[in-house]
Amino acid sequence: MNLSRIVLSIIPARRLNKSLRILVMVNTMMVFIVAMFTPFYAIFVERLNNNIAIVGFSWAVFPIVAGILTFLFSRWQMKVKEQELLLAVSYFIRGAVFLSYAFMGSISQLIFTQVLWGVGAALGTPAFDATYGAHTSREGSIVEWGQWEGMAAIATGLAALVSGIIIQEVGYFWLFSTMALVSVFLGIYIWRLPRELL
């Protein structure tokens, strides 16, 4: 069965236009792969350095960098003609982040990786929101945004269930390698889409 059909069968009554369907499908996959790791981050970092303060510090680096860079990048992003390409670039960056996790060897590498993840989020999150918002309708925007948020929440929960089993059975390396491959695939998919679709 086609992945987009599965996603669309879960989405409630109101049908999304083609652009929104693509964005929901692609970004739901990204949310899913990110959520495969976040519940197990502390366990992963404790293997590198058995210090809970380092776990907290290293995780804090990602959202703080993402937040600061979102402020700095947003004015520049407004000038970018094809903002969906920023989304593709952010997926490529996240692919590099997950590959770095697969070969993680030190706390300094972890901090660098978290900074890089912040860069990817600062490029991708506003680009997704702007692109998605541009394709919503005034009268249906609550439903259209609600469908995206609902899918993201379900994907987050399912990812935690699946990844716990994957980590237990095959370890972090294969989880991160898969996450990296999917991220790069999503970036290529968005990059190669005809521009008029997004």
Where are these regions (language model features)?
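Helix-loop boundary and gating motifs at the non-cytosolic
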Residues: 9-63
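Loop-to-transmembrane helix entry/capping segments in MFS-fold secondary transporters
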Residues: 52-53, 138-148
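Residue-level signature of mid-helix packing/kink "hotspots" within the transmembrane helices
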Residues: 63-71, 156-157
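Helix-to-loop junctions at the C-terminal end of transmembrane segments
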Residues: 69-82, 167
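Structural signature of the two symmetry-related core transmembrane helices
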Residues: 85-99, 180
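Helix-loop junctions at membrane interfaces in 12-TM secondary transporters
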Residues: 102-113
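Intracellular juxtamembrane helix-capping segments at the cytosolic ends
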Residues: 123-136
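A membrane-interface helix-boundary motif in multi-pass transporters
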Residues: 165-183
